[in-house]
Amino acid sequence: DERSLGRQGFWKKVVIFAAGSFMNFLAGFLIILAVYSGAQGFLIPAAAGTAPEFEERNGQTIQAGDIFYSVNGERVYLYSDVSLLMSLHQGQPMDLVVLRDGEKVELNDVTWGTYTGTEGETYQGYGVYIARDQIEEANLWTILKTSWLNTIDFVRIVRLSLQMLVTGQAGMDDLSGPVGIVSTITQVGTASETIAAAVENILYFGAMLAVNLAVMNMLPIPALDGGKIFFLIIDEIAMKLFRKKIPEKYEMAVNTVGFVALMGFMLVVTFNDVFKLFG
């Protein structure tokens, strides 16, 4: 059959294999867009100044109204990114870049320690105050922009999570499978003050899950679409170098092993979810 997958060209196969992830990504974006469609405004990731000890320890200061641009090389897209990215480096020096009057200002090796808070209390942190009153008015452009940036932020969260798993900063207890996801959705819904807030929070979680699946499916792991695309690339390279494709039996063997390993991993994660639920 001329329409069978095996008879399609390289790029058409790539598009076919990537289509599922693209639709998941698009679904995540559209859900976030729906959630934000009723927003009145969006918090700007701006600073409200620093603790009294900050300038003495770091040699310079952050002024009220400075916009956070990056934290340790990671771009700040949303208001929530500031505290999230800072929390990943607790106890270690941190590099900050802020925008002041449109110009980038770098603050390297910002010290972690005991600082005075806005109410006079002491706390462990970086001595940076984050503004809560800088708001960007919601309109068609800002809703589209924030929805897109939030979707991209979900992709980064997946990348950072994988990074933490590989480096040992996170373990099996931090992973969730289907049981854990259902449990989280239930918690998100019941913790909300109103039905409208519950629906909004569950939709937000659903959007994050959709983007998560999109990214994970594109990883070059056998049995996933990303693995199939990886094999297509290897085949294409083999054809150009040796005028010969990799035998299909080897690809099938690798995919089978990958599928069994993936199912085993999911089983372990599911058991872990159950133990956490009833433990």
Regions found by a protein language model. Name each.
Residues G20, N217, D225, V254:
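Divalent metal-coordination and catalytic microenvironments
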Residues D1-G49, N255-G258:
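Internal alpha-helical transmembrane segments
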Residues L96, T151, N217, I221:
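Conserved hydrophobic/aromatic pocket- or pore-lining residues that grip, position, or stack substrates
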Residues Y69, L84-T122:
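PDZ-domain C-terminal substructure recognizer with occasional recognition of PDZ-binding tails
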Residues E2-W11, A48-E55, G113-L213, I233-V257, ...:
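Functional transmembrane alpha-helices
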Residues R57-Y79, T151:
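Conserved PDZ fold ligand-binding element
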Residues F25, F29, V211, V215, ...:
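Hydrophobic alpha-helical transmembrane segments of multipass integral membrane proteins
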Residues A223-I237:
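Juxtamembrane non-transmembrane "cap" segments at the membrane-aqueous interface
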